[in-house]
């Protein structure tokens, strides 16, 4: 899988490529993007839109929401719901998606990680 460079795992001991090898369903992809150079913010949003146009058409895609940190923080959080890790693997290896990645500005750091819901009785359902 090609990643936006520089690529920084959220958990060094359990990187994204390893997560993609685990069968799980449904799941959420959280991708933290840090736009190190503020001048690259518009370019980041343009590249994100182009990649999202491909991702949102992939089998197994459920929904997506991009959030920007408040204040002057250069951090974005992308929350994507998928029906399975198999769907995420296929989408991230799609040639049309991979072709969009070089458009991300070089100062953008991506940190993807996969999650599943956890049940907490009385508060959260899984």
Predicted segment positions?
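Short, surface-exposed ligand-recognition loops at beta-strand->loop->(often short) alpha-helix junctions
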Residues: 34-46
């Amino acid at each position: 899988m090609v990643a936006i460079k520089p690529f920084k795992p959220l958990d060094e001991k359990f990187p994204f490529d390893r997560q993609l090898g685990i069968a799980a369903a449904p799941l959420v992809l959280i991708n933290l993007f840090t736009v190190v150079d503020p001048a690259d913010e518009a370019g980041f949003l343009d590249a994100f839109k182009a990649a999202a146009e491909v991702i949102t058409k992939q089998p197994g895609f459920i929904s997506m929401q991009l959030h920007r940190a408040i204040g002057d923080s250069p951090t974005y959080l992308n929350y994507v719901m998928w029906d399975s890790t198999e769907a995420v693997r296929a989408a991230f290896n799609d040639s049309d998606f991979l072709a969009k990645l070089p458009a991300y500005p070089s100062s953008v750091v991506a940190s993807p990680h996969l999650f599943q819901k956890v049940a907490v009785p009385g508060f959260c359902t899984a």
